[in-house]
Amino acid sequence: MGPRKKSAKVCVMDSEVAEEMTADEEKDYMNQLSHEVLCHIFRYLPLQDIMCMECLSRKLKEAVTLYLRVVRVVDLCAGRWWEYMPSGFTDSSFLTLLKKMPDVEQLYGLHPRYLERRRVRGQEAFSIPGVLEALQACPNLVGVETSHLELVESIWTYMPHVHILGKFRNRNGAFPIPPENKLKIPIGAKIQTLHLVGVNVPEIPCIPMLRHLYMKWVRLTKPQPFKDFLCISLRTFVMRNCAGPTNSLKYVPLVTGLASARNLEHLEMVRVPFLGGLIQHVVEDSWRSGGFRNLHTIVLGACKNALEVDLGYLIITAARRLHEVRIQPSLTKDGVFSALKMAELEFPQFETLHLGYVDEFLLQSRMANADLVKYGLADVVENPGIITDIGMKAVNEVFSCIKYLAIYNCPHLHNPYNWISDHSRWMRLVDINLVRCHALKLDSFGQFVELLPSLEFISLDQMFREPPKGCARVGLSAGTGIGVSSALVSNQNSNNDNDNNAPNNNANLHDNNHHHPDDSDDDNDFRPDLQAGEAQFAADALNEMEDMVQEDGELVAESGNGMPAHNREVLPVDADEEQAGPSGLQRVVKPTPIADHDSESDDEEDSLELQEVWAPKNGTRRYSEREEKTGDSGQSRETAVSGKGKTPLRKRCNNSHQTGQAKPFPLEESSCEKGCQVTSEQIKADMKAARDVSEKKKSKDVYPSCSSSSSSTAASTAGNASSPSTASQSPDFARTVTSSGSSEPSPPEVDVSRQCVCSPGGSEDSEAMEEGDAESSVCPRCCCLRPQESQRRTGRCSDEERPSTSRACVVNGADGTRSAFSFRTLPQGGSSGPAHDERTNGSGCGATGEDRRGSSQPESCDVQSNEDYPRRPLTRARSRLSHVPLISESEVAKTKPCHAMKRKRTADKSTSTSDPVIEDDHVQVLVLKSKNLVGVTMTNCGITDLVLKDCPKMMFIHATRCRVLKHLKVENAPIVNRFDYAQCKKLNMDQVLDQILRMPPERNRIIYLRPMQQVDTLTLEQKLFSGPYPYHICIIHEFSNPPNVRNKVRIRNWMDTIANINQELIKYEFFLEATRTEEDLKKYPKYPWGREIYTLEGVVDGAPYSMISDFPWLRSLRTAEPNSFARYDFEDDEESTIYAPRRKGQLSADICMETIGEEISEMRQMKRGIFQRVVAIFIHYCDVNGEPVEDDYI
């Protein structure tokens, strides 16, 4: 306030008063102060500033001399222990300085940047002998703080009475351990804290004063380095990745010495190969006398020989004060916590548990275990922790007060929901951090989060990841190598049809909710009005699938009303060239196809070359079954359970001409094919079918070929219907099959080639085809071609306009009930399925169930020429969507046969992970519902959609390198205000921004984006400023590379200032509040859309930025002169950031309003409204070329 009064004195004065003022200003007030006052002032100044005052005046020089003569504590680094002391010292100057301080007792900050080992005659330098000489010139010296290895060893040698103050921490540590870093510790050294990093030490002797010993990358050179180890005052012992003796017996003195430290609080041993069971025996001997009783932190990591009893005894002994435990993977077992549970102990202060703990150095080091062993570290190969859901339930029963839980790489954890029991409620859990738990199920995790009453923070790293391409087809568990042969695994997970069971193929996985799907078809066998989609569920239940199917994701065979709500809203995703879907997969409810015969062996192909000209890769089984059913209904059960594997038999269709209606076939034979993997039951059926193959060959004829190679290529898709070109060769009539299985003739004037014969009852298409995919428009269920205009939905939003969380495909049942199915977006080169007639106004080729049953003339689809067929086989991702063919096989048999052609081999078989397929990203929706959740952080996760269902306290979302994260849906999260999306390759930026800006304006919001694709800035700005968003909007385009965070960090300071001014004006000055209703949007259809938009540009640290905004007041505040409250201790100004309010003195809304008073009056006269809240969107363009830029701040 002083400077403010001074500025208020500015007025007209006569010359005499001005001369008096000048005389007063020229007075030297410092020289008028007494020596005592000056010495008191010097106590608050750094030594460097005090020494600079010597040359200012004689009185100040006297005061400095007097101060140095009486000073007892000197800090050469002015309290900044991490810095180096001032440079420029030599031996003589340092000696002169210390001679001026005869009474100094404690010398802090003796951190020279460089010291010579010895003096050089005739040359001024700063050397170790010179420093020792200067220290010895201080007779009262008690202690010195330093970080120099050779200097501290010299002090111990030549000045043993001097204490080493503070924390000794050498600053030249590295790995591999530099040979020049050496330190010999004498017995009884006067030091309390010793931190050694990358040092060669002969031994750790008896040091009674030592309280904290920290050793990292220390090489212990003596054969018995702990022979004399005894530190009775020790409170902290940390030994990480040290190169010590390999003989486990040589660590016995170490553990016994630690037991004698009765005040030991922190015990951390990483890669220490002590003898297994040693700690157990030492605890048994010492616990009565207080050994390990006061531990509050226990860390065991990569200790090769450590046993469960060692850890258990430590935990039990320290139960009263234990705060934190970090457990290495080999000890992360159910048995540890079961035993602790039986001990019936209480842990009143316990808060933090880290399971599967792996040291940071081992995680970040690129060295293999052999390289580490070469440098002297212990030979340890860690396997993942084997704790299961049963063990996790026991964790909370043991540690009921746990607040922070971290789990690393525990692949046998599946259902977090099962961690909760009557005795395990996780009532106090505040923070959960999951890393690489690849089998954890997403839906179960969401349910677990919902039941945690105190949870505030979630951190997910490498969770719910997508498997490599093809892993889903060969039964591999994503990225872990845990899996079984594809010949033994049922493919419930065909291509993108991943569910929660597929990755969990380990025999030792604990899950008590197994069931077989055989019980789901009882009500459907005799329902003739069953829809095709429902029939598939019933048919799938008759096939032997995986031996473990989870209850929580059970496929419901009856009407859609029986499905849980979270399954009804399963979300499709965009067509993409990469597969997403991790090991712990969310249940996606789909029409599950039945088994097909997928023959890929060369021998069988040669033998069946002439018999199978039209041989679709995925689905000829249905034809053979139905033809056999027509010829002999008694064979239906034999053909219903047929195998599929590496080289199963491919069944061929009968060519007998049927004159009457086909007999109704069982429902289990009317579904889509399943995939490419087999069960043991199906293998047995294959063997039986092989014995009868000669009989069946007699009753089967050749399938007619398609008219061209391109047709045959397209035919290798689903195989559920004949190809369009085949159908078009007999345009007389076609038969449509009702849901009961009978066929009806259609009028002969309807061209079969123009019909879509695949559509299940009323199912709508999953997503519109990409507009760029004009080269082929293929119906996914029958491969009939449709024109592009019929593919594009007229009544639906595009993917950019509408998140996948709001789209669900609905199949109308016969009784009006609804069943939810999630159909994938089709790969490029295919097309989306037939659209629901409500959505396409009749332009699609699908019909409702009632239409199909009651009408003899199904809706038709237009056809394009054959050259528009895709030039590659359509994938299983397409073929699994195929339904029952509606053309009778008798009509297929009447078509003209073409010349036999050997089918083109592709790698699309069950044992290949290099298939020539384009797979969609697996839809994985993380639904968060929590009363206390504050923030979620996701890194390298395979989640595609994030839904904030009910998070009233949520404040931030951070997503980094989430490759398939696309959408955000906010249902109820009113105060979330910070969004950070960095290097998320497939993020739908328009949809995310729209969701955030549509939230009610209860908070200012800031959005950080680092896109990995080009951004159309003009379109983006138009959408944001013209949209119905009741915020002032600021878009900042940052082009620094490598990334500069200066602007990003500073935005938060001044965006709130703008909002605070607006709120003051609206609440207390009765300023007009702006709105963005539909009427406002119609009123301002063109630029600037009712906003006052302006642009600011500049350069920060050599990188340009551009800001387009309608923030009021900002331009005036930026250009205003600094006021009396200006703070110049702040590092930023207008040249280094967009706006620096502290440099201007604009510290509050009231001060700012004084500055912009005129502009406020003008706005009031213009009756221009303002919004109460603001949104800042910061877009960093360093990654837009698709290559992520390394960034320490990310």
UniProtKB/Swiss-Prot annotation:
It comes from the Eukaryota. Residues 493-510, 705-728 have a biased composition (Low complexity). Keywords: Adaptive immunity, Cytoplasm, Immunity, Nucleus, Phosphoprotein, Ubl conjugation pathway. Residues 855-867 have a biased composition (Polar residues). Its main location: cytoplasm. A motif (Nuclear export signal 3) lies at residues 451-460. GO terms for molecular function: ubiquitin-like ligase-substrate adaptor activity. Induction: Up-regulated by IL2. Down-regulated in tumor-infiltrating T-cells. Residues 487-529, 577-776, 793-879, 896-915 are annotated as: Disordered. One of its GO terms (cellular component) is cytoplasm. Residues 599-609, 764-774 have a biased composition (Acidic residues). Expressed at high levels in embryo (developing brain, spinal cord, branchial arms and limbs). Widely expressed at low levels in adult tissues, with highest expression in testis. Expressed in postmeiotic spermatids. It is found in: Cytoplasm, Cytosol; Nucleus. A motif (Nuclear localization signal) lies at residues 902-905. Pfam families: F-box (PF00646). Disruption phenotype: Conditional deletion in T-cells does not affect the development, peripheral homeostasis and population of memory T-cells, but leads to faster tumor progression. Faster tumor progression is caused by higher levels of Pdcd1/PD-1 in tumor-infiltrating T-cells. A motif (Nuclear export signal 2) lies at residues 307-316. PANTHER family: F-BOX ONLY PROTEIN 38. This is F-box only protein 38. It comes from Mus musculus (Mouse).
